[in-house]
């Protein structure tokens, strides 16, 4: 039995490196002060293969900011030489990405089956959606809202006590494949809803008076790919005629200033906006569902990582939303509540000025559909681990995020429209 468990451990650990192994890859953080520094990074990106972690692309780099990016092992010396010769201040956040990837799995022996305190692959999450619905029929129902490019079923969980004409909160996770903490939170939220209903006054009130539409993984194809082939994959896995490059950035594919700023029309770019708004089956499924339930959905919450931010519209424009003061006040209260548990500090504000301009985002689109409480959460951390947050941080991350989500939900309930 012990030999079997060890085999399972080794198999799981190696599965994430069956394609890209990331041995010797480094993640750098560069301190950008001015336009000259930005030009130098553009020059570097044109000669070396750089995987931008924050922001998503070199085109989104702003003065007086920090830039995190991954470099393949064979390019690390050249990149460090370039940064040093040009006076760009930097530090190495991750000196060997493979070691960090293996360390994200805290338990040496991986249990089979679903766990809320570990990262689960799609097969496990899919089975969990069926099980959690069948075990809690008075609180949860599961429905299919579409299929992905590769034919995987997109499952949605409706969480709430049965009732007619109930207002709703829509929450999705897993837009970007490598942001594993995001689907972990959606699963945690469902667990907490079931566990605390009838025991905790706020959750009981929420589920009596509201429905939560929870989409645990939007980009299923990409998420699967991060488990089997390339842990750092971001986009979907769709293909298109005339290009050898794969995938679209789902969070550039919505009809909100589509492909106008902070997005690329190059299929090989990490921020490729797609051939048209809602060209991807996944974004179309989300948009269709929301359009069909627009009269009931009062808040839209989309969960990403990393950088510890709570963002609201707009990202495709520097204009402020009509209820900017209200959204700012709500975000301020939510991040204060979040920080009260573990002291985790979040920045908050409109997307374009707080993080970077980006068009085609789901939060902007939802807001423009009339959903006035629309927020993006960028979960832990601020770059020490980035996209490879250890499993030991799942519980504290989810616990504190729950406080913010519940704060927003309480406000929405008190300000129905």
Swiss-Prot record:
Residues 1-16 form the signal peptide. Belongs to the peptidase M14 family. It is an enzyme of class 3 (hydrolase). This is Carboxypeptidase B. Chemical modification of Tyr-356 leads to loss of enzyme activity. Chemical modification of Glu-378 leads to loss of enzyme activity. Its cofactor is Zn(2+). PANTHER family: CARBOXYPEPTIDASE B, PROTEASE FAMILY M14 CARBOXYPEPTIDASE A,B. Pfam families: Peptidase_M14 (PF00246), Propep_M14 (PF02244). The active site is at 378 (proton donor/acceptor). GO terms for molecular function: metallocarboxypeptidase activity; zinc ion binding. One of its GO terms (biological process) is proteolysis. Binds 1 zinc ion per subunit. It is found in: Secreted; Zymogen granule lumen. GO terms for cellular component: cytoplasmic vesicle; extracellular space. Disulfide bonds join 173-186, 245-268, 259-273. It catalyses: Preferential release of a C-terminal lysine or arginine amino acid. Zn(2+) binds at residues 176, 179, 304. Keywords: Carboxypeptidase, Cytoplasmic vesicle, Disulfide bond, Hydrolase, Metal-binding, Metalloprotease, Protease, Secreted, Signal, Zinc, Zymogen. The gene is CPB1. InterPro entries: CPB_M14_CPD, M14A-like_propep, M14A_act_pep, Peptidase_M14. Residues 17-110 form a propeptide. Substrate binds at residues 176-179, 234, 251-252, 305-306, 356. Residues 118-412 form the Peptidase M14 domain. Its EC number is 3.4.17.2.
């Amino acid at each position: 039995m012990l030999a079997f468990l060890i085999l399972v451990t080794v198999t799981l650990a190696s599965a994430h490196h069956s394609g890209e192994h990331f041995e010797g890859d480094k993640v750098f953080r560069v301190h950008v002060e001015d336009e000259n520094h930005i030009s130098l990074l553009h020059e570097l990106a044109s000669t070396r293969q750089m995987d931008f972690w924050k922001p998503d692309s070199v085109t989104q780099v702003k003065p007086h900011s920090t830039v995190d990016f991954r470099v393949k092992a064979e390019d690390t010396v050249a990149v460090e030489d370039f940064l040093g010769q040009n006076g760009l201040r930097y530090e190495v956040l991750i000196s060997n990405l493979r070691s960090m990837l293996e360390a994200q799995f805290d338990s040496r022996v991986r249990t089979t089956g679903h766990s809320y305190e570990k990262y689960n692959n799609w097969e496990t999450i899919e089975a969990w959606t069926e099980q959690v619905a069948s075990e809690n029929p008075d609180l949860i129902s599961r429905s299919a809202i579409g299929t992905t490019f590769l034919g995987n079923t997109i499952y949605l969980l409706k969480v709430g006590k049965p009732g007619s004409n109930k207002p709703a909160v829509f929450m999705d996770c897993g837009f970007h494949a490598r942001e594993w903490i995001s689907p972990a939170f959606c699963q945690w939220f469902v667990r907490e809803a079931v566990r605390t209903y009838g025991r905790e006054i706020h959750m009981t009130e929420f589920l009596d008076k509201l429905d939560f539409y929870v989409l645990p993984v939007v980009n299923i194809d990409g998420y699967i790919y991060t488990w089997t082939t390339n842990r750092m994959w971001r986009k979907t896995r769709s293909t298109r005629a005339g290009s050898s490059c794969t995938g679209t950035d789902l969070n550039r594919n919505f009809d909100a200033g589509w492909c106008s700023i902070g997005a690329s029309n190059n299929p090989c770019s990490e921020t490729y906006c797609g051939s048209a708004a809602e060209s991807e089956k996944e974004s179309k499924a989300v948009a269709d569902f929301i359009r069909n339930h627009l009269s009931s959905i009062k808040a839209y919450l989309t969960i990403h990582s990393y950088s510890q931010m709570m963002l609201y519209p707009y990202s495709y424009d520097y204009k402020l939303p009509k209820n900017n003061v209200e959204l700012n006040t709500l975000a301020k209260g939510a991040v204060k509540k979040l920080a009260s548990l573990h002291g985790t500090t979040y920045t908050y504000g409109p997307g374009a000025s707080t993080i970077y301009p980006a068009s085609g985002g789901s939060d902007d689109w939802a807001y423009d559909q009339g959903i006035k409480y629309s927020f993006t959460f960028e979960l832990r951390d601020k770059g020490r681990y980035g996209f490879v947050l250890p499993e030991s941080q799942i519980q504290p991350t989810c616990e504190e995020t729950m406080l913010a989500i519940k704060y927003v939900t309480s406000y929405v309930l008190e300000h129905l429209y």
